[in-house]
């Protein structure tokens, strides 16, 4: 039974200080997760869906999937009824789908601030920032390797972004911290600099264990044992390979009842067939095997049907984004996920552009809109992605985060209430009049149209007098304003101390490693 997290101010001492911080904290608006009141775009009919589902079962049974360097996984599959030949697992037709049936269709990920908790699945859409880039870019410093301070600044920006529901995970890779210890600092940043839900570490099973233990400090061990407080990204090594590191992290999280996104990582034409139907077949086969394995580890473990698919430039070999083929796969995979009864992850503000320019805007908009119409429930990379995922851009982060607002508005559908019908205004104004001064307009104008908090709507003369700033420059100014006004959300000092002590102990337990 899901519970409300215990009050942070009264646990582990320090309650008075926490309550004082709570009273004086500056509050930032945060929109609730999107509730989709519009239909999904279904690109496949029943015949097409059935064909792809049958082909995926054929892949699992005849071609099989590889669980590399993982004797425990092979033993689990053998016991479940699969045929194991070396590291290859051949899953009889229907077995994976039957195992997937124990996965929940929706679940709640709890945040340390209960007002920020999110439901993942059903008609909800949860938006999370960019994940994984080793580089960052801003107008002041250009392109450079990311640092821990960059990471903290992205977490701060995410916390202050109204339309962003989730703090994410590796918003950039802090290369100035040892590889084997940076996960501790990253998780701590999410826990202390934001009160939104966040993701755990997956780069080694021991780091997943550390993530769970830190959550037990933050939320309380009893609460974590009964509730989901992390959603973490498990990438499949496409085609059809499940490596031991990712599966080890999945095992840790599934055993702890923490959520995993089971996600093929596909560049079409390189890691999957060049055709949409062929790629969808592979996506479904990989997700079926991954979700089924999570249920073998712990029946009922929360999972998300993930899809990260992009196309390839056959001239250069570079991945391409915002393409119609990728959108078709996104739409089709969404239908397959809904037929399985699983939450769905895909989409994002994806682009191959090197700068936050027109290419970045076009490509990102194509995928953001496809994700909304495709029924996505959890969208990673919703803001900040640049250069094919190699770069996290500060300016693009705030520009993208601003453009998540229209997704909320579009998803709400059409207001058909008496006020929404506008008949009062039509009667008042009549033929040849104008609506600016009528009572209906005066009563509704503040909320009638979505308005950007970043983009420029001024006349040319005013825009020119103010410096003729382009979108990137406007984004830069917003980043600076947000960071200057940032204030940490309140947290019990005793919990912060316990987190710091745990991190110090873990860092002291092994030497630094940068590889």
Residue ranges and their predicted role:
Residues 2-9, 13-29, 43-55, 63-64, ...:
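Catalytic-core signal marking the mid-to-C-terminal active-site face
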Residues 369-391:
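Glycine-rich phosphate-binding active-site loops on the catalytic face of alpha/beta enzymes
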Residues 38-41, 315-322, 349-356, 384-396:
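Short beta-alpha connecting loops at secondary-structure transitions
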Residues 2-49, 57-61, 67-82, 90-125, ...:
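N-terminal intrinsically disordered, cationic/polar leader segments
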Residues 342-348, 378-383, 413-422:
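Acidic/polar loop patches that form or flank catalytic/metal-binding clefts of enzymes
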Residues 142-373, 377:
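Helix-rich catalytic cores of soluble enzyme domains
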Residues 45, 49-56, 66, 70, ...:
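Generic structural signal for well-ordered, non-membrane alpha-helical segments
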């Amino acid at each position: 039974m899901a519970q409300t997290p215990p009050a942070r101010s009264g646990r582990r001492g320090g309650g008075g200080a926490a309550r004082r911080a709570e009273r004086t904290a500056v509050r930032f608006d945060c929109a609730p997760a999107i509730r989709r009141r519009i239909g999904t775009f279904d690109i496949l009919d029943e015949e097409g869906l059935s064909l792809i589902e049958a082909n995926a079962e054929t892949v699992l049974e005849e071609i099989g999937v590889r669980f590399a360097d993982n004797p425990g996984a092979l033993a689990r599959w053998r016991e479940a009824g699969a045929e194991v030949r070396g590291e290859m697992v051949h899953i009889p037709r229907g077995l994976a789908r039957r195992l997937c049936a124990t996965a929940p269709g929706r679940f709640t990920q709890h945040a340390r601030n209960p007002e920020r908790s999110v439901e993942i699945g059903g008609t909800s859409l949860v938006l999370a920032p960019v994940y994984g880039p080793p580089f960052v870019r801003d107008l002041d410093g250009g392109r450079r390797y990311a640092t821990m301070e960059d990471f903290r600044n992205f977490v701060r920006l995410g916390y202050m972004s109204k339309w962003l529901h989730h703090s994410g995970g590796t918003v950039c890779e802090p290369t100035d911290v040892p590889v084997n210890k940076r996960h501790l600092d990253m998780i701590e940043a999410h826990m202390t600099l934001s009160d939104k839900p966040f993701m755990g570490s997956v780069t080694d099973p021991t780091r997943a264990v550390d993530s769970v233990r830190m959550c037990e400090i933050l939320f309380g061990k009893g609460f974590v044992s009964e509730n989901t407080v992390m959603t973490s990204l498990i990438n499949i090594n496409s085609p059809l390979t499940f490596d031991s590191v990712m599966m080890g992290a999945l095992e840790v999280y599934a055993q702890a009842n923490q959520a995993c996104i089971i996600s093929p990582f596909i560049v079409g034409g390189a890691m999957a067939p060049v055709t949409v139907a062929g790629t969808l077949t592979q996506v479904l086969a990989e997700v079926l095997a991954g979700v089924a394995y999570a249920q073998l580890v712990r029946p009922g473990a929360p999972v998300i049907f993930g899809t990260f698919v992009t196309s390839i430039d056959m001239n250069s070999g570079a991945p391409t984004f915002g393409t119609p083929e990728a959108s078709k796969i996104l739409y089709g995979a969404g239908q397959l996920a809904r037929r399985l009864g699983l939450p769905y992850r895909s989409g994002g503000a994806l682009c191959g552009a090197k700068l936050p320019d027109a290419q970045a805007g076009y490509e990102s908009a194509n995928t953001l809109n496809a994700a909304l119409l495709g029924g996505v429930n959890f969208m990673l990379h919703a803001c900040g992605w640049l250069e094919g995922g190699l770069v996290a851009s500060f300016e693009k982060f705030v520009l993208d985060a601003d453009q998540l607002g229209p997704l909320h508005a579009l998803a709400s559908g059409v207001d058909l209430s008496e006020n929404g019908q506008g008949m009062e205004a039509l009667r008042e104004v009549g033929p040849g009049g104008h609506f600016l001064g009528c009572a209906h307009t005066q009563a509704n104008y503040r909320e009638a149209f979505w308005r950007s908090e970043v983009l420029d709507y001024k006349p040319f003369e005013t825009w020119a007098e103010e410096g003729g700033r382009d979108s990137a420059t406007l984004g830069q100014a917003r980043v600076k304003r947000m960071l200057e006004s940032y204030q940490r959300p309140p947290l019990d000092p005793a919990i912060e101390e316990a987190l710091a002590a745990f991190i110090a102990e873990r860092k002291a337990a092994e030497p630094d490693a940068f590889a």
